[in-house]
Amino acid sequence: AMGGEPKLCLNIMAVPESMPKEAVHDILRGGYDKVYEAGALITGGHSIYDDEPKYGLAVTGFVHPDKVLTNSGAKPGDALFLTKPLGIGILTTAEKADLLSENGKAFAVRLMTTLNKAARDVMVQYRVHACTDVTGFSFLGHASEMATGSDVQLEINTAAIDLIPEAL
């Protein structure tokens, strides 16, 4: 979320001891496939046993020092773009409680496995002043952090925000 190009990645994984090795392999293979799609390499990682499965990547990349984007560079008059619909956290929480439909699961997986590479490739062609990735801190949390860090006010057209229907 800084405008850089990913180059090297480390796997970070926690799995229950009872998880089948095939499932662990599939998770790691999926990570490898996405890293390859992004044009980067996995150079190692770390794994532990835990009751709840978790997988992520620590990513190192490169960006020209004059083109580093942070969440505190927004300027008055900037437009705010969302590259994915909001609500994925609600879907994943619903899945943990076995409340998510099969369509909802498929949609969540598709969103979570879609790289932000296309958005990044478009973004670096323009004079972007700030960016962030909406995570568990929520859209409003990230918007507040961006506004405060940039010393600007945000005007949000809530009708224009793409929301995941099943998250409502």
Please provide the spans of the model-predicted regions.
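Helix-biased detector of long, well-ordered alpha-helical tracts
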Residues: 1-168
